[in-house]
Amino acid sequence: MLTVGLIGAGRIGRVHASTISMHANSKLVAVADIIEDNAQKLASDFGGQVCTVDAIYKNKSIDAVLVASSTDTHSEIIEKATLAGKAVLCEKPVDISLVRAKQCLENTKPNGQPIMLGFNRRFDPNFVALKSELDAGGIGKAELLVITSFDPAPPPIDILKVSGGLFKDMMIHDFDMVNFLFEGLPKSIMVSASSVIDKKISELGDYDTAVATLK
């Protein structure tokens, strides 16, 4: 039985809590959130004891930490959780800053704990089947991949301020699919982006619509 401590009881935290509760070999034992009411409601719905983040680190009965808090907290939580001997599944991205993300990777290597990012599409049966067909040559040689993604609505502005925005929080899934299917990193990238839905997004220096070409 894998015991899990969940940090972050917002929308995606509830999705993860539901998944943990449905799996026969995992159990949610602790929940922490800066908004205690959110943590209390999640614990009431899916189990687990409401506690602090530090209490999750110190709890020796917890095998893994699932990080579903805001992006600006990810790298520090990853470092502290692995130092405490916990495996980590973290929502993407590791950090808004590439420098800080790389630093986090280096800082956690000595801790020897597995770390995984929430690139769930790699486990989607449709993408897995496509990957298998590509590897087997069943659909010929791949020369061009077109990915079109939509969100039902832009995220709240408060979330955009700390999430990483369109590229680091949302399109990151599409970039990862290119890496997954083609087994490599792009040599170059060109992007055309704009903000046409909500001018508040533009005021943040972010975008709601973009086309990216990776080579």
Show which residues each predicted segment covers.
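Basic phosphate/pyrophosphate-binding loop/patch that engages nucleotide-derived ligands
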Residues: 106-114, 128-142
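N-terminal Rossmann-like dinucleotide-binding module
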Residues: 1-46
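NAD(P)-dependent dehydrogenases' Rossmann-like dinucleotide-binding region
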Residues: 12, 118-122, 134-156, 170-174, ...
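Rossmann-like dinucleotide-binding domain that binds NAD(P)(H)
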Residues: 155-215
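Glycine-rich, N-terminal phosphate-binding loop of Rossmann-like dinucleotide-binding domains
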Residues: 68-69, 149
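Beta-strand-loop-alpha-helix segment that lines the small-molecule cofactor/substrate pocket
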Residues: 63-64, 70-71, 75-119
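Short acidic low-complexity segments
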Residues: 49-60
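Short, Asp-centered acidic motifs that coordinate Mg2+ and/or phosphate
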Residues: 30, 64, 144
